């Protein structure tokens, strides 16, 4: 199993590390620590004297320093993760750092296409407490990466991921997606609760669709349990 752990080097992202280790400690695998730092700085044309070459200035001063700093922090984060793995006695897990310059969105998508990971692990907040899930990066990555993604809130304490709620709108991809969830979480033998919200409790069309989805799993072999339920709500 291969996991891409995408980080901005913030303290908030430390919550990702125990999950990455726990997913792999039984079967083994590789954790790719990924970080992309911006290699372009935009400055207003009237910010400096007209005879100053701002492109060269930022290339030789700020951007070079940014690269050095990113390399140093990546080394520290990699060593920290390796030490955590050793403490867990998980000798079957390897760590590979990937540090690149460029747009984080584009670089993560390209890395995903190249490495074909089983899972991308990300935080929901970055430096300065920015709400990552409200940004455009995550929306783009989710639509352009054909890879399962797991987002962990920064204030969430690690625990076994056993109880899973899967909200379905009866997509043709439901069976494949649920199979992937079982595969990723097989270490925990998860209990997956498949739910669909309906405004009318006696909606027969929705009931039939849920029954068909349930039938698809009757003869499947998987580690864990799966339950199906229609949930009545006035605000579906």
Place the predicted regions along the sequence by residue:
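Residues at secondary-structure transition points
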Residues: 11, 61, 65, 99, ...
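Structural beta-alpha unit
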Residues: 41, 68, 72, 76-120, ...
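Short, flexible hinge/linker loops that cap or flank conserved catalytic cores
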Residues: 89, 158-159
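Small/aliphatic-rich secondary-structure junction motif
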Residues: 1-60, 162-227
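Residue-level recognition of beta-strand->loop/alpha-helix junctions
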Residues: 35, 99-101, 153, 196, ...
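Gly/Ser-rich helix-loop-strand patches that form or flank binding pockets
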Residues: 26, 106-157
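A short acidic, glycine-rich active-site loop
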Residues: 55-72
């Amino acid at each position: 199993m291969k996991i891409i752990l995408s980080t901005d080097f913030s303290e908030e992202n430390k919550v990702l590390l125990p999950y990455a280790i726990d997913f792999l400690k039984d079967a083994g695998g590789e954790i790719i620590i990924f970080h992309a730092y911006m290699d372009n700085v935009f400055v207003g044309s009237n910010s400096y004297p007209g005879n100053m070459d701002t492109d060269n200035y930022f290339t030789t001063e700020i951007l070079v320093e940014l690269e050095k700093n990113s390399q140093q922090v990546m080394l520290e984060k990699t060593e920290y993760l390796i030490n955590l793995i050793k403490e867990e006695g998980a000798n079957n897990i390897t760590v590979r750092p990937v540090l690149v310059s460029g747009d984080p969105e584009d670089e993560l998508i390209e890395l995903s296409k190249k490495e074909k990971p089983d899972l991308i692990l990300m935080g929901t907040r970055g430096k300065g407490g920015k709400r990552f899930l409200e940004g455009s990066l995550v929306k783009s990555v989710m639509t352009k990466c054909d890879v399962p993604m797991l987002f962990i809130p920064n204030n969430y304490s690690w625990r076994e991921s056993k109880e899973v709620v899967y909200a379905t709108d009866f997509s043709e991809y439901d069976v494949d997606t649920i199979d992937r969830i079982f595969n990723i979480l097989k270490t925990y033998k998860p209990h997956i609760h498949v739910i669909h919200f309906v405004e009318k409790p006696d909606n027969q069309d929705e009931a039939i669709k849920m029954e068909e989805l349930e039938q698809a799993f009757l003869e499947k072999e998987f580690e864990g349990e799966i339950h199906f339920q229609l949930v009545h709500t006035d605000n579906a």
